Amino acid sequence: EESTLESARRELEEETGYSASSWTYLFTGPSSPGLTTEMVSFYLADGLRQVAEGGGVDNENITVHRIPLSLVHDWLMDQTGQGKVVDPKIFMGLYFLSRRLDGSGREEG
């Protein structure tokens, strides 16, 4: 069975076409508390480079959007305002990312 980090690496490449040179564990939490015991782990992938087209495998239909971090919140609000479905885990991941970064997009330290 692959580790959560191995899964994250594989999913990043399959779904987005990118690989990362470094990974930082952020947190693990339930995907749907009360409905399932499935847990989801979040990692910060850094040093991205495009290595493939992305878009998923088999019958997945994934569109990759490249949005500057400073514009992500407004872009997500626009998407939900248009009635598009945005996975709440995206907001959760961005929240924990924002706790690690200062306002300039650099890691606090």
Where are these regions (language model features)?
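Conserved Nudix-box catalytic region and its N-terminal flanking loop in Nudix hydrolases
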Residues: E1-R10, E14, L48, D58, ...
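Residues that recognize and position ribonucleotide moieties
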Residues: L5, S41, H65
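Active-site segment of metal-dependent pyrophosphate-handling enzymes
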Residues: E13, G17-V51, D78
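Nudix hydrolase/Nudix homology domain
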Residues: Y25, P33, Q50, N59-G109
